[in-house]
From Swiss-Prot:
PROSITE patterns: ATP_GRASP. InterPro entries: ATP-grasp, ATP-grasp_carboxylate-amine, ATP_grasp_subdomain_1, PreATP-grasp_dom_sf, PurT, PurT/PurK_preATP-grasp, PurT_C. This is Formate-dependent phosphoribosylglycinamide formyltransferase. Residues 119-308 form the ATP-grasp domain. Belongs to the PurK/PurT family. It catalyses: N(1)-(5-phospho-beta-D-ribosyl)glycinamide + formate + ATP = N(2)-formyl-N(1)-(5-phospho-beta-D-ribosyl)glycinamide + ADP + phosphate + H(+). It comes from Pseudomonas putida (strain W619). Its EC number is 6.3.1.21. GO terms for molecular function: ATP binding; magnesium ion binding; phosphoribosylglycinamide formyltransferase 2 activity; phosphoribosylglycinamide formyltransferase activity. Mg(2+) binds at residues 267, 279. Pathway: Purine metabolism; IMP biosynthesis via de novo pathway; N(2)-formyl-N(1)-(5-phospho-D-ribosyl)glycinamide from N(1)-(5-phospho-D-ribosyl)glycinamide (formate route): step 1/1. Involved in the de novo purine biosynthesis. Catalyzes the transfer of formate to 5-phospho-ribosyl-glycinamide (GAR), producing 5-phospho-ribosyl-N-formylglycinamide (FGAR). Formate is provided by PurU via hydrolysis of 10-formyl-tetrahydrofolate. The gene is purT. Homodimer.
Length: 393
């Protein structure tokens, strides 16, 4: 039976969030609604989730000693990673010492890099994936590309938001794609994955919740990426019954293997009735921001319920919905957003501004949300709203 105490008192139920971006911010808001005391940790001050947490710490989360010190001082009931770039070996140690890591320390460790999760899916679970090789040197990479064939995709094994990811169409792309992957890795230069390109009809995120009552699948989320980074998403994505059933089978297999409770973002490629596993995040997914307007319980509310052991009897989806990112480029520590009245002038629209303290280059600073009679209309409405927002540096 779940019992939640009073924040900032001896009975408080404490959650420590590792990573404080826009997704973490929404998770904190949902935990706050349930009376949970939230401690936010990230590598820079005033990160979005810190702005709505009870208190925060600035720590390099790849520094296991520093991360452990904060966790031991705060004594949280739940440790909730919101990003991949964490000292996962320390989380494994802490879990073995009795701390509760969401969903599990193993899940955060396996999904921190593409190699762990790809080998689990393809080699242990025998799930359909694109052909792939890993390489540490340019020579091995060139051989792998020759083996996989063109077109193919190269990615650092450790990166996020599409950093370092590119499509190779011929030998002319070989050197520049290698260089780009080496620049884009989260830990600097290093290992890459080379994947055969799947000529898919569309790609989806199947948001999958492991909770006290079992596993719940949300309506599939379609999305459009540029350079591996999400630009817009919509729900529900139309699929054949056979493809949907196969997507749920793949999602169940991989989330069961990772274990624990929480929401997972399972990324899949779909062509006709065929489905291929791509990646999984053991946490809310950026494409799932659409659920802030498309469902009675957003992915963030569902994650909070699952973490706390609360039931999820039903999730109601409100019909065709879409999200479109606000993605300016510039430099500022005092960004402002104008023309919001025009952006919100149509019915069934909403805006989330993330409150990121600075921008240096191109950065996702907010998202516009919309519902309408069709997916096409919802996408167009969300895009109109996003384009109406004026970003001032």
């Amino acid at each position: 039976m779940t019992r939640i105490g009073t924040p900032l008192s001896p009975t408080a139920t404490r959650v420590l969030l590792c990573g404080c971006g826009e997704l973490g911010k929404e998770v904190v808001i949902e935990l706050q609604r349930l009376g949970v005391e939230v401690i936010a940790v990230d590598r820079y001050a005033n990160a979005p989730a810190m702005q709505v947490a009870h208190r925060s710490h600035v720590v390099n989360m790849l520094d296991g000693v520093a991360l452990r010190a904060v966790i031991e001082a705060e004594k949280p009931h739940y440790i909730v990673p919101e990003i991949e770039a964490i000292a996962t070996a320390t989380l494994v140690e802490l879990e073995n010492e009795g701390f509760n890591v969401v969903p599990t320390a193993r899940a955060t460790q396996l999904t921190m890099n593409r190699e762990g999760i790809r080998r689990l899916a393809a080699e242990e679970l025998d799930l359909p994936t694109s052909p792939y090789h890993f390489a540490d040197t340019f020579e091995d990479y060139a051989k792998a590309v020759a083996d996989v064939g063109y077109p193919c995709v190269v990615k650092p094994v450790m990166s996020s938001s599409g950093k370092g990811q590119s499509l190779l169409r011929s030998d002319a792309d070989l050197q520049k794609s290698w260089d780009y992957a080496q620049e884009g890795g989260r830990a600097g230069k290093g290992r890459v994955i080379i994947e055969g390109f799947i000529d898919f009809d569309y790609e989806i995120t199947l948001l999958t919740v492991r909770h006290v009552g079992g596993t719940t699948y949300l309506e599939p989320v379609g999305h459009r990426q540029e350079k591996g980074d999400y630009q817009e998403s919509w729900q529900p994505q139309a699929m054949s019954p056979k493809a949907l059933a196969e997507s749920q089978r793949v999602a169940k297999a991989v989330t069961d293997a990772l274990g624990g409770r929480g929401l997972f973002g399972v990324e899949l490629f779909v062509k006709g009735d065929q489905v291929w596993f791509s990646e999984v995040s053991p946490r809310p997914h950026d494409t799932g921001l659409v659920t802030l307007i498309s469902q009675d319980l957003s992915q963030f509310a569902l994650h909070a319920r699952a973490i706390l052991g609360l039931p999820i009897p039903v999730v109601r989806q409100f019909g065709p919905s879409a999200s479109a990112v606000i993605l300016p480029e510039g430099q500022s520590q005092q960004t402002s957003f104008a023309n919001l009245g025009a952006a919100l002038s149509e019915p069934d629209t909403a805006i989330r501004l993330f409150g990121k303290p600075e921008i240096n280059g191109q950065r996702r600073m907010g998202v516009c949300l919309a519902r309408d009679e069709s997916i096409e209309a919802a996408r167009a409405k969300a895009t109109r709203a996003a384009q109406a927002v004026k970003v001032e540096f």
